[in-house]
Amino acid sequence: MMNKKDARLRRARQTRAKIAELKVNRLTVFRTNSNIYAQVFSECGTKVLASASTVEAEVRKELEGKGATAAAATVVGKRIAEKAKAAGVETVAFDRAGFRFHGRVKALADAAREAGLKF
């Protein structure tokens, strides 16, 4: 019998396989109860080009310690878009890592789009 984590990881594997066929940079999101993380991987999937999370000192200062909210995800989305553009990445494929496209994951994606990242 499959538990929630195994089901999420199965969905993530399917998504990552489809993205790997496209040969594009991948924006991946990881969500915990207390933080949210975002990374942009290279086309081959082995090199991290940019990363942002609510663990970073600048983000923590801006959020006053509240790292598990949609507002925090919005800040991380803007930062990942800025860092990706600085690394020369304009277009990515969005990898939600099996999480539902809702709440914090959606807030991060919308903020990254508004900041100029295309996906």
From Swiss-Prot:
GO terms for cellular component: cytosolic large ribosomal subunit. It holds the Pfam family Ribosomal_L18p. InterPro entries: Ribosomal_uL18_bac-type, Ribosomal_uL18_bac/euk. Part of the 50S ribosomal subunit; part of the 5S rRNA/L5/L18/L25 subcomplex. Contacts the 5S and 23S rRNAs. This is one of the proteins that bind and probably mediate the attachment of the 5S RNA into the large ribosomal subunit, where it forms part of the central protuberance. HAMAP family: Ribosomal_uL18_B. Belongs to the universal ribosomal protein uL18 family. This is Large ribosomal subunit protein uL18. It comes from Cupriavidus taiwanensis (strain DSM 17343 / BCRC 17206 / CCUG 44338 / CIP 107171 / LMG 19424 / R1) (Ralstonia taiwanensis (strain LMG 19424)).
